[in-house]
Amino acid sequence: MGIPVGKSMLVLLISLAFALCCIAAYRPSETLCGGELVDTLQFVCSDRGFYFSRPSSRANRRSRGIVEECCFRSCDLALLETYCATPAKSERDVSTSQAVLPDDFPRYPVGKFFKFDTWRQSAGRLRRGLPALLRARRGRMLAKELEAFREAKRHRPLIVLPPKDPAHGGASSEMSSNHQ
């Protein structure tokens, strides 16, 4: 005859929920905040430098800064590159100006967060698109706890013996020998 309306609606809702989960898995979103955002911007923009707000030519009346876009919303490599500064001089001009600097000129990192490994990790995550659960610190902790729980469950003994109670366990054999 036909499938009842209630069952068909249930199947439709389940398949819709499954489809939404699959779509969310294929669209990874990366959020970067604080030092990790600065490190990633320094890595992506390298010697060009970067802005925390977009240049005035692209800005509208209510433009969001990179912190609002990357820390509170999803952030990808293309968005980060829009905040890179354009080089002021051509490559030829830069090479001649560097020759003027003395050799003992101090070349310190500009910025508090100068960790190349952190740059590579953040930019690598942006390129790879790891699941959001593994990217978040809280998610990594939950994953470790889950793995520890599974490991403990795997090594659980088959039979748990009760602890010996002196009133019942050890004393009963002595008392029975005294009564005989």
Swiss-Prot record:
Residue ranges of the region described as C: 53-64
Annotated positions for site Important for interaction with integrin: 48, 58, 61-62
Database matches in InterPro entries: IGF2 (IPR022334), IGF2_C (IPR013576), Insulin-like (IPR016179), Insulin-like_growth_factor (IPR022350), Insulin-like_sf (IPR036438), Insulin_CS (IPR022353), Insulin_family (IPR022352)
Signal peptide range in chain numbering: 1-24
Prodomain residues: 92-180
Intracellular or extracellular location(s): Secreted
GO molecular function: growth factor activity; hormone activity; insulin receptor binding; insulin-like growth factor receptor binding; integrin binding; protein serine/threonine kinase activator activity; receptor ligand activity; transmembrane receptor protein tyrosine kinase activator activity
Region (D): 86-91
PROSITE patterns: INSULIN
Post-translational events: Proteolytically processed by PCSK4, proIGF2 is cleaved at Arg-128 and Arg-92 to generate big-IGF2 and mature IGF2.
GO terms of biological process kind: animal organ morphogenesis; cellular response to mechanical stimulus; embryonic placenta development; embryonic placenta morphogenesis; exocrine pancreas development; female pregnancy; glucose metabolic process; in utero embryonic development
Primary location group: secreted
Additional free-text comment from the UniProt record: The IGF2 locus is imprinted. Paternal inherited gene is expressed, while the maternal inherited gene is imprinted, hence silenced.
Similarity comment: Belongs to the insulin family.
Name of protein: Insulin-like growth factor 2
Species: Rattus norvegicus (Rat)
Underlying gene: Igf2
